[in-house]
Amino acid sequence: FLMMSMGPISSAQIGILPSVEITCDDPGPVEVWPGATRTTIVYCTLENPSIHSESVEIGTESEESDFQFAAPQAVTIGAGQEMDIQVMIRVPELFAAGTYSANITAKVTEANGIDVAAITSTEEDSVSFEVMKYGSCEVMMGQGGGVIEAGDPVVFAASFVCGANAEFSIGYSLVMIEEGAMSSIWPSGFE
């Protein structure tokens, strides 16, 4: 998922010590209904403001341990250059609706081939994204059958199987159709 786009930084901003800057855009919302991709993509820009070619380690974290991340483990950024990367976040099916955050981190581990991890700090950017609400029910209905006369009680049985990631309600109604009425006026699903 590494997409590279490189460009120079102005020479007035170039520094001597190895460092990296990271900025990320908030990703789009995540749909979690059965069959959905359940993913969103974070677009980040890494900037190397130093005079060194740097190896930068990328990290991901969230308070939600169920989230899965896919990101490049490390990238190399030339002196005074920028690079764009993508981080994919995957959420479990029917995960609770709401707004969540994730952190994308970057740490310079090498400068010009020399290990500098002990003297560099981890930089991070936090993003927020929304897990969308979902609710759906399958309904199975039946009735005892036979001929029903005027005034006879009618018993219907209904079975509801619902899946949701947030509180929701759904309504159903029964429509009685006169005998001999055209079936084309019946509600969808009745014959």
Labelled PLM ranges:
Residues 9-191:
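Long beta-sheet-rich domains in secretory-pathway and surface-associated proteins
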Residues 1-5:
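Bacterial N-terminal signal peptides
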